[in-house]
Swiss-Prot record:
Upper lineage: Eukaryota, Viridiplantae, Streptophyta, Embryophyta, Tracheophyta
PANTHER family, per the entry: CLAVATA3/ESR (CLE)-RELATED PROTEIN 3 (PTHR33869), CLAVATA3_ESR (CLE)-RELATED PROTEIN 1 (PTHR33869:SF18)
GO biological process: cell-cell signaling involved in cell fate commitment
Keyword Glycoprotein: yes
Modified residues (Hydroxyproline): 66, 69
Protein name, as recorded: CLAVATA3/ESR (CLE)-related protein 1
Length: 74
């Protein structure tokens, strides 16, 4: 009986492995031909963000000054 269970288990594993190799590819749009609308919009947002960053520069601080000394500092 144990031998039969082992053979059945081995058979099911072999069948599942053979079916997974014949399935469709995991990333059908990997070649870049068809892209989704969300992906295109994300690329546009990223491009606009990079352009804004390049205009402003990398070394400029985005912090705002509080307008005076902080009395609670030190």
């Amino acid at each position: 009986m144990a031998n039969l269970k082992f053979l059945l288990c081995l058979f099911l594993i072999c069948v599942s492995l053979s079916r997974s190799s014949a399935s469709r590819p995991m990333f059908p749009n990997a070649d870049g031909i068809k892209r989704g609308r969300m992906m295109i919009e994300a690329e546009e947002v990223l491009k606009a963000s990079m352009e804004k960053l390049m205009e402003r520069g990398f070394n400029e601080s985005m912090r705002l000054s509080p307008g005076g000394p902080d009395p609670r500092h030190h």
